[in-house]
Regions:
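Metal-dependent phosphoester-hydrolase catalytic domains
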Residues: 78-82, 166-273
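N-terminal, active-site-proximal structural segment of metallo-dependent hydrolase catalytic domains
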Residues: 1-52, 58-59, 65-68, 165, ...
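Soluble or luminal CAZymes and related metallo-dependent hydrolases
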Residues: 12-16, 87, 127-138, 144, ...
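Surface-exposed cleft-lining segments at the edges of enzyme active sites
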Residues: 111-134, 174-179
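Active-site beta-strand/loop signature of hydrolases that rely on acidic residues for catalysis
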Residues: 5-9, 24-42, 106, 140-167, ...
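Structured beta-strand-rich core segments of catalytic domains in phosphoester-bond hydrolases
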Residues: 37-40, 44-118
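Short, solvent-exposed loop/turn segments at secondary-structure junctions
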Residues: 11-13, 38-40, 64-65, 76, ...
Length: 273
């Protein structure tokens, strides 16, 4: 069977519900993970997703900020809401997907952006971001299967991770080395988290590291397509147990041109299980 998982920082699910519905009709992913829903749980537009067949949903939201949601056609066997760094700020939810046999664990993450100043002593938002990455690396390392385990851990992590880790994940590597999202300390911590479960960078399985690949373009760039000053902030990671199942990926760049567009576009991966 095939499983398609998409991730999208929607920058307000209620404001852009029409775009989300349009995307779901267009691509029909089995699971869509949203970040920055900016919506308290009691106001989440459940009926719209129910009508499109996404009958299994896990949401955690708050007014005006943050918020994550997993919308699925696949049943859940379990769900968890995680609180990171001692905060209940709606940044990490987890669902176990029932696909027969051992479930696939799915993490939807919205890691802090980190503000503008890349100094944790001067900027509490940046300090929070670094702490979040450290906590995730430690937490994932605690879930690593034993070397001789017969079955490896089947886990997928998606979301707006707010780090562009590779040289060609940004429009200008040298200029952005001192810009939050591409600083050496962030890239190093991203690498530590990636190493914690030997995560596979799914899109880079198909687009080699020497080629530009973006998922975000600032609203400040009026003609974003011409300037193409993008960054790859949105990621899909899979554990080695799923390596042989990875069969495709898509970044829907054209959605950045839609009316009321988010500054992020959806990233999708396909797994043949």
């Amino acid at each position: 069977m095939s499983l398609t998982v998409a991730t999208w920082n929607i920058n307000s699910v209620r404001l852009r519900i029409g775009n989300v519905e349009r995307y779901l009709r267009l691509r029909k992913p089995d699971v869509l993970c949203l970040q920055e829903t900016k919506c308290p749980d009691e106001f989440f537009p459940h009926l719209a997703f129910e009508a499109l067949g996404y009958t299994h949903r896990l949401v955690q939201g708050m007014k005006s900020y943050n918020g994550v949601a997993i919308l699925s056609k696949v049943p859940f066997t379990a769900t968890t809401i995680h609180h990171r760094c001692g905060k209940e700020d709606c940044r990490h939810i987890e669902a176990a997907l029932d696909l027969g046999g051992d479930p696939i664990l799915l993490d939807n993450l919205y890691i802090p952006a980190g503000g503008d100043i890349p100094d944790p002593d001067e900027n509490v938002k940046f300090a929070h971001k670094l702490d979040f990455y450290r906590e995730m690396a430690k937490w994932y390392a605690g879930h690593k299967p034993r070397p001789r385990a017969r079955k490896g851990l089947r886990r997928i992590a998606v979301g707006d991770l707010n780090v562009a880790p590779l040289e060609h994940d940004v429009w200008n590597h040298k200029q952005l080395l001192k810009i939050v999202s591409h600083t050496p300390v962030e890239v190093d911590l991203f690498g530590q988290m990636q190493a914690s479960l030997d995560w596979i960078d799914v899109p880079r399985r198909f687009v080699t590291a020497d080629r530009k690949l973006y998922s975000w373009w600032s609203y400040r760039n009026n003609d974003w397509r011409v300037s193409n000053r993008g960054r790859r902030l949105d990621h899909i990671l899979a554990t080695p147990a799923l390596s042989g199942a990875i069969s495709g990926h898509r970044i829907d760049t054209d959605l950045r041109d839609w009316e009321k567009a988010s500054d992020h576009v959806p990233v999708m991966a396909t797994f043949d299980l």
